[in-house]
């Protein structure tokens, strides 16, 4: 029997890096609400009560980025030093400039072209309903549930910062059981750790992970140091784009290296990543293969991909040449086509910033639809 263990992690929206992703995407959405052709690349850094926002923007929109940032931080749940960030004492530095004209002349044409060179990957597997690796799906579900029990006071004494991790045992390539679960939950100084562990097992872990995946030897680690009373930006510096594996496939497949948050869809890092996932997911949903990874590469100022690579990890049920042919016929992989077909010039990005850009079923996540599977099936023959 071929047996191995794979681990994935996720974080709550209160994790310092995710706070920054949320701020970046909230700012992006505000620009897109007023001007759908906005060119935006905004990043930020948060530490203690300091927030630095920087980037390049070309837009007719007028956005109060400081106001957007503070509102986002409040929505997450930060308010005081003890919670991790005191919005009343925040120091905000901004440095936002216009997009380089050298870049703009390659992007702003009759048809939108790539705003930079780069390679991206999309991945899909049929091992879960979301077509995500199961460990990644479970990690996101745990982090989302951890946030829910805090916001709804199902578990008292929690603050926004938190993390989850799932180690999953595979047998002959199929998920078998959970080896371990890790939760980190930022809490009030007065919170009893034994009570917290009991509550999180009952209200988070047992609500998310099916009992069929739990074994007697499954280990659970909650705030493993014994205390997590100092958290959020008060404990750790946060930075936009530092959770790219959490954002994607939890360590399965490959990553082109480019982060998503704060970038408008003319940036191939974002739009082409969404398209590569869309392609991979539809190929798996059409039952052409059990697993699929799609690489797309682009050149700045060019409309169409420089290269397309499809890896089915030996699970293909049709000749790979046929799969390539069908992919090219069904999907418009030009940057302009991606933006139009996935309707990416809308203010939809704040929702993507936490709990993964993939495996979601909200209407905004057009790249998660499997609406091309029937066309693929008809063409494959």
Question: Where do the language-model regions lie?
Answer:
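Short, charge-patterned binding micro-sites
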Residues: 41-59, 300-304
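Internal helix-turn-beta structural module
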Residues: 47-48, 289-291, 299-381
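A short glycine-rich, hydrophobically flanked beta-strand micro-motif that places a catalytic Asp/Glu
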Residues: 38-42, 162-168, 218-222, 288-299
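Glycine-rich anion/phosphate-binding loop at the beta-strand->alpha-helix junction
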Residues: 191-283
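Glycine-rich, mobile lid/loop segments that gate access to catalytic sites or pores
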Residues: 7, 67, 74-230, 354, ...
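Alpha-helical support elements that line or immediately flank enzyme active sites
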Residues: 13-32, 128-144, 263-287
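Conserved phosphate/anionic-ligand binding catalytic regions in large, soluble enzymes, centered on
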Residues: 9-11, 15-20, 112-127, 229-253, ...
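N-terminal, positively charged regions that mediate nucleic acid binding
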Residues: 1-41, 46, 380
